[in-house]
Amino acid sequence: MYEQNSFEAKLRELIENHPSKEKEIRPWGGFITLWSDENFKVKILLVLPQKRLSLQKHKFRKEKWVIVEGEALITKGNKKFIMGEGNTLMIEKEEPHRIENRSKDKILKIIEVWMGEKLLEDDIERIEDDFGRV
């Protein structure tokens, strides 16, 4: 079993050393923007072991997820299910969703594609959050 601090250090190193100018560390892990255009944005989400993003929805964008490494517990609407490497999922505008990394020893990596009329980080309505950001 690995220490959470070693995962946080590894994640910080991955994000800080990436050449992208748009990257951020969050309480659940972090993200790196790989490409941004007028109508779409491509990011990689890095979710720390035993962490999850807020249960959230978006007014102006839909999202497509591709699990590239690890296994995720997904909440989509009122359904929960497991997705593994290679699985994809579409999240529609206004649809509540969440990603959770249930692994104890692996960073979850997801490619996230935003599509919509406004592609802003603040297009988020948090419904539930482990870090007090609701």
Q: Which residues does each predicted region cover?
A:
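Double-stranded beta-helix
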Residues: 2-25, 98-134
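Short acidic-glycine-tyrosine-enriched beta hairpin
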Residues: 77-96
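Glycine- and acidic-residue-biased ligand/ion/polar-headgroup-sensing regions
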Residues: 49, 60-73, 77-78
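A short glycine-rich, His/Asp/Glu-containing loop-to-beta-strand
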Residues: 19-57, 61-62
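Short beta-strand segments
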Residues: 53, 79-81, 123
